[in-house]
Structures are given as C-alpha cells and as structure tokens.
C-alpha cells in the first residue's frame, strides 16, 4: 500500500468518525483530536481538512431537514408568528457562542486542544449527563433506560420547537459556549443545556440540530477564511474523500438519533464518554 493510498484511507476513516460523532453527545472534535493522533494523520492543509469534513456533516443535517428549513425561511419572511419566534430563538441561541468564539477561540484552541483535556472533559461530561438524565422522570412500565417523551413529562415546559421560550433558547446558547472546549460536545452541551432549561429530550435534540446549522456554517466559513492559505493541492483528494465520508455517515446518524431519543435516554452515551475518557487517559499515561 502506497503512502498516498494510506493517507486517503485515513482521511476516509476520519470523515466517518466526524459524521458518526458530530450529532451525538460524545464530542466529534475530541474524537478527531484523539483518533487523528492515534493513526498519525497529518494534513498539509492543517485546519482546512477538519473544517471541510465538518461542513459535510452540516450539509447532511440540512438535507434531512430541508423541508422544515424551507418552511422556517418562508414563514419568517412572510411573518408567520411561530416561525418568526423559532428564528428568534435560533438567533438567541447562536449569538453567545458567536461572540465568545470571535473573541476567545484562538486562545481556547491554544490552551485546550490536547488529548489530556479531551480525556477529562469526556469523563466529566459523562457524569453530568448521568446526573441530568437521573433528574428526568420516568413513567411506570418504561423499559430500563427508556424515558417518557410525552406531555406527561411534568418537568419539561417545552414539548415542541414552537413552545421553546426565548429564555430557554438563550440558556441553550450559553451551554453551547462550553462546547468550545474539546471533549465537551456541541450537541451534548446544547441538548443537556436544553433539558436543564425545561425542554423535552427529543425537542432539545431537534433544536440542537437546527442550531448546528448557523453555528457550524458560521464556524466553517470563518475557519476556512482564516486558513485558506494553508490549502494544498496535494491534499485535495484527502479533503474530498473526508467530506463525502462525513456527509454520508452523518445522514445515517441524524435519522438514527431522532428515532433513538424517542424511546431512550442518553445514558448509553454518558457511559461511553466515561469509558473512552478513561481509555484516553490510560493511553496518555502509557506514552
């Protein structure tokens, strides 16, 4: 196997990792940092590779929600109240991370982008998820790990996207700021933040997917603009392979997650985070 073929296989693998982990609460960035280090993936285009494969993931979620997205855009432009309110909530949730990111993202990456930080945040985030899920009420007859995702969930005040309040949306936005630290997980922070704010689990998950569109698109455009000079012709094939792999795998994951959260909690992901964090810590210690 030639070096160029091996490089493409690594890019394909990392694209799959990005697509599989971007929309579940396990931290795609943390996985890319750790696994990229494990397989010794080196891109001459630097940050551009990561930006492009994340763009592949966000295009997948936009494709899946294309009908609802078009309804949102059309309704907002024509003044439909519930669509205007939904757009307002997305803007409120987007702004905190946009402001904090514009000011501090360079410092955050310099200080926190390290496997050791990922190990700690994976474990801590896992225990926080377990704590939040433990607070979620269950109905009699639920299977182990299943939760009530109906209006009988008395602790949730928002059971649909239209019922989310401006205060709840802003709370989700503040939670998203924490996800700038690798290993925290953007989807995990926004979903758990939403649940703490009183948004039902499935609705919080859907809101997280919609919030990912402006957040990830904005971050991708900003990072691509800042790093376009690093783009190498030699790396174009690897970037294209990673993009396609991320897009296709994200298509599968987003649909699967929406089905999963209708009848299950996020506990399995919490335990996965804790286990992976301990493995990463052991690997760092053994190096």
UniProtKB/Swiss-Prot annotation:
Annotated Pfam families: BacA
InterPro entries noted in UniProt: UppP
Major localization class: membrane
Superkingdom of this protein's organism: Bacteria
Gene Ontology cellular component annotations, sorted alphabetically: plasma membrane
EC annotation from Swiss-Prot or TrEMBL: 3.6.1.27
Topology of this chain in the membrane: Multi-pass membrane protein
Enzyme class of the recorded protein, top EC level: hydrolase
Single annotated GO MF: undecaprenyl-diphosphatase activity
Transmembrane segments: 6-26, 45-65, 89-109, 111-131, 204-224, 238-258, 266-286
Catalyzed reactions: di-trans,octa-cis-undecaprenyl diphosphate + H2O = di-trans,octa-cis-undecaprenyl phosphate + phosphate + H(+)
Localization per Swiss-Prot or TrEMBL: Cell inner membrane
Record GO biological process: cell wall organization; peptidoglycan biosynthetic process; regulation of cell shape; response to antibiotic
Protein's UniProt keywords contain Phosphoprotein: no
Entry keywords, A to Z: Antibiotic resistance, Cell inner membrane, Cell membrane, Cell shape, Cell wall biogenesis/degradation, Hydrolase, Membrane, Peptidoglycan synthesis, Transmembrane, Transmembrane helix
Family to which the UniProt record says this protein belongs: Belongs to the UppP family.
Other remarks in the entry: Bacitracin is thought to be involved in the inhibition of peptidoglycan synthesis by sequestering undecaprenyl diphosphate, thereby reducing the pool of lipid carrier available.
NCBIfam families found in the cross-reference section: PRK00281.1-2, PRK00281.1-4
Known function: Catalyzes the dephosphorylation of undecaprenyl diphosphate (UPP). Confers resistance to bacitracin.
Protein name (Swiss-Prot/TrEMBL): Undecaprenyl-diphosphatase
Gene this chain is encoded by: uppP
């Amino acid at each position: 196997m030639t070096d160029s073929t091996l490089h493409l296989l690594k890019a394909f693998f990392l694209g799959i990792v990005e697509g599989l982990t971007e929309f579940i609460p396990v931290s795609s960035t943390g996985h890319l940092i750790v696994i990229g280090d494990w397989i010794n993936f080196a891109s001459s285009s630097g940050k551009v590779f990561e930006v492009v494969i994340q763009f592949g993931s966000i295009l997948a979620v936009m494709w899946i929600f294309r009908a609802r997205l078009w309804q949102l855009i059309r309704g907002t432009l024509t003044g439909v109240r519930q669509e205007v309110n939904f757009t307002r909530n997305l803007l409120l949730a987007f702004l905190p991370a946009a402001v904090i990111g514009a000011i501090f993202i360079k410092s955050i990456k310099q200080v926190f982008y390290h496997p050791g930080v990922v190990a700690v945040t994976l474990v801590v985030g896992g225990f926080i998820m377990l704590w939040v899920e433990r607070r979620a009420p269950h109905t009699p007859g639920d299977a182990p790990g299943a939760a009530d995702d109906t209006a009988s969930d008395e602790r949730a005040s928002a059971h649909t996207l239209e019922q989310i309040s401006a205060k709840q949306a802003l709370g989700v936005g503040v939670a998203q700021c924490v996800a700038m630290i690798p290993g925290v997980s953007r989807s995990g922070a926004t979903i758990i933040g939403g649940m703490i704010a009183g948004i039902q689990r499935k609705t919080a998950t859907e809101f997280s997917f919609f919030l990912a569109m402006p957040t990830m698109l904005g971050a991708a455009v900003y990072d691509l603009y800042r790093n376009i000079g690093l783009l190498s012709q030699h790396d174009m094939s690897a970037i294209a392979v990673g993009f396609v792999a991320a897009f296709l795998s994200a298509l599968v994951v987003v649909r699967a997650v929406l089905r999963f959260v209708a009848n299950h909690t996020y506990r399995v992901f919490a335990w996965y985070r804790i286990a992976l964090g301990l493995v990463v810590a052991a690997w760092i210690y053994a190096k």
